[in-house]
A protein has these predicted regions:
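Ribosome large-subunit tunnel/peptidyl-transferase-proximal elements
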Residues: 1-17
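Alpha-helix capping/helix-boundary segments
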Residues: 7-8, 26-27, 53
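Alpha-helical elements of the RecA-like P-loop NTPase motor core of helicases
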Residues: 10, 32, 56
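Extracellular/luminal Protease-associated
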Residues: 17-28
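Nucleotide-binding motor/catalytic cores of P-loop/tubulin-like NTPases across gene-expression machines
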Residues: 28-36
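Short basic, glycine-rich beta-strand/loop surfaces that mediate nucleic-acid
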Residues: 36-75
């Protein structure tokens, strides 16, 4: 799993993002471009009610605007 807009952008660019979660109450300047990238990449997208909910779901003590499950790299 990756948490945060920068890490999510990297996961989308590399094709590793499998399912993206965005917080509805996060700044649209952050979430809208990420949602557009998800649509362009054909990546599943789920909107979560709040940053606090998404942060808790990710196991962190602060809110998160964005997160994703990612494919593991195989060596």
């Amino acid at each position: 799993m990756v948490v945060g807009a920068k890490q999510l952008r990297k996961a989308l660019a590399s094709g590793r993002a499998q399912h993206v979660f965005l917080a509805e109450n996060a700044d649209p300047a952050i979430t809208e471009p990420l949602a557009d990238l998800c649509v362009a990449a054909g990546t599943e997208l789920t909107w979560v009610a709040s940053m606090a909910d998404l942060g808790r779901a990710c196991g962190i003590e602060v809110g998160a605007a964005a997160a994703a499950t990612v494919a593991q790299l195989r060596f």
